[in-house]
Amino acid sequence: MVERDNELKGTTFTISVLHISDGKPERIRQLLAAKVAQAPQFFNCAPLVINVERLADIPDFDQLKGLVESEDFVLVGITGARDEAMKTAAKAAGLAVMASGKSRKVEPLPLPEPTPSPVAEVKAAPAPLVPSKVHVGPVRSGQQLYAAGTSLVILGSVSQGAEVIADDSIHIYGALRGRAIAGAKGNTQARIYCQQLQAELLSIAGTFQLSDALPAGLIQQPVHVRLDNEQLRIDHIK
């Protein structure tokens, strides 16, 4: 068995950002509780970053951290800090200080190209096809379906409070009133299709949208959902 050295690699995660304009604990608690109520399993132990750009005063970060964790989120850091005092206070509470927006990519230094050695061409065997998981009938409230390594096809409606998950795409031949999570293991090419959109939550590869952010003109309409530039795009199916 070949031992590999420890490695530090860069990667990208989708993290919810909470924008606050005051540090009043009760208002923050109510907002988080409302989001958790919409999708309890999705937000369970979910990482959270707080944008403090609109705060005039430095909040009690220890208190804020405890409040966030009491609602089953994990506070990992802040963004939008405009002065060093706020950054120092956040670091003292064990929080990361993160830059706002997207960071500029750092180009790696060019390495000398090795002299290629003749290699015999080996044709890889095609990966075996994994058949889609098909569910006939409605998915009832409290029920969860998961299609591991494949797509999920539902010949029926998904009730409010139900959850359907697939590592690939999700096809719903009925109304979607619950939660649909496609690309559960990071497949950004996954899609969600449904004949009637009333979802509590839509998610593809970790990028999600809740019911209160759905386009009003597409409610109860047949739609196709996909990732476009790291955001969910919802199109009407004609």
UniProtKB/Swiss-Prot annotation:
This is Probable septum site-determining protein MinC. Gene3D superfamilies: 2.160.20.70, 3.30.70.260. Keywords: Cell cycle, Cell division, Septation. It holds the Pfam family MinC_C. HAMAP family: MinC. Belongs to the MinC family. Interacts with MinD and FtsZ. Cell division inhibitor that blocks the formation of polar Z ring septums. Rapidly oscillates between the poles of the cell to destabilize FtsZ filaments that have formed before they mature into polar Z rings. Prevents FtsZ polymerization. InterPro entries: CAP/MinC_C, MinC, MinC_C_sf, MinC_N, Septum_form_inhib_MinC_C. GO terms for biological process: cell morphogenesis; division septum assembly; regulation of cell division; regulation of cell septum assembly.
